[in-house]
Amino acid sequence: MKKFAAILLSLVLTLTVALADSIYVVSREDGSGTRAAFIELTGVEQKDADGNKVDMTTVEAAVYSGTSEVKTTVSQDVAAIGYISLGSMDASVKALKVARNPEDGAGAVYVEATPENVASGDYAIARPFNIAYKADNLSATAQDFINWILSAEGQAIVTAQKYVAKEPAEYQAASVAGKIVIGRSSSLGPLMQKLEEAYEALHPEVDIEVQISDSSTGMRGAADGSFDIGMASREVKASELEAGLTPVTICMDGIAVIVNNGNAVEGLTLAQIRDIFTGEIVDWDEVK
């Protein structure tokens, strides 16, 4: 009996180690601007034989519809890896350094995910935060809000929220009132909340209603008039421009590749990130 128990314990320990070494891939949902930017910048998006772009994210990936869900999942699983807006980073997870060099080995320079490295272009996984609107549907109130976001005051909030600000534009406050309906992605949550609060404090007669969705829904809503302003955590697509949208970049953001704080890995190359998220690399031992 003791021999059987020892064998059983050995099998359990072996299985536990194997499971700990297996990579648990965590992804955002289709329609997410963060996912669209991530797969493009890391090479997870590839072209098929006909030249069509295909998202090659592994079918084994766990898919979540918001930034907080991805972050929580990774924080609770030592084998997990995911990606979130750099502006949403906190101490619950660890951001990996990323090497722009697509091949592993000597010469790879691992760069920390920071606003400074995004601004300099040294950090490879970065994307714009865009707003978009239909010019013929834009109210004076919504236009003033956009102008204020691009002002020194609005861009100071951008910087305070760990995003990369633009050169501020001149702003002349207007006497405005009314409601602004905005559709945004979850990645824009921390920033949008601060911008909304500050603008409403300056303009008590303005009510900003924010509907949380994803980037694609935000762009569709702006095009069909459901939203005054749509917000996307990616580039605005050609099809969205053809629908009559006018895009405005409000800042730049990095996409942090995150792991559990208990994970010993400190950095990955773009090639390794691609291979993990396409299912070519399945064990942490392959990148340690």
Regions found by a protein language model. Name each.
Residues 1-8:
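Positively charged n-region of N-terminal signal peptides that target proteins for export
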